[in-house]
């Protein structure tokens, strides 16, 4: 059964947050990024996402959740950045709080 965006977001949080060691875990969900196969999530250290501290930047893969399977996976960030099938829409109910 396909997962909703909200279910996918919680899967990502449950997968990454408990063992996060680089700064304070942050899932920036102000935008919903997706294509027909998966949701894309922006996670990282709050110190980088909010404060702009480059020493907390993480380079490499981007977490995704496969819609049909509900499985957390990853894709290279360059692949995600250049994938024309990925759509971006403002999230009407973000959990992200910048303050």
Located regions from the model:
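Exposed beta-strand-loop-beta-strand "reactive/processing" segments of non-cytosolic proteins
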Residues: 26-67
């Amino acid at each position: 059964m396909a997962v909703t965006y909200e279910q996918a977001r919680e899967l990502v949080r449950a997968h990454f947050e408990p063992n996060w060691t680089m700064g304070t875990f942050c899932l920036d969900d102000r935008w919903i990024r997706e294509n027909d196969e998966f949701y894309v999530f922006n996670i990282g250290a709050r110190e980088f996402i909010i404060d702009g501290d480059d020493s907390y930047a993480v380079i490499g893969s981007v977490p995704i959740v496969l819609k049909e399977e509900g499985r957390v996976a990853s894709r290279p960030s360059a692949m995600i950045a250049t994938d024309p099938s990925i759509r971006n829409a403002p999230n009407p109910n973000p959990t992200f709080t910048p303050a």
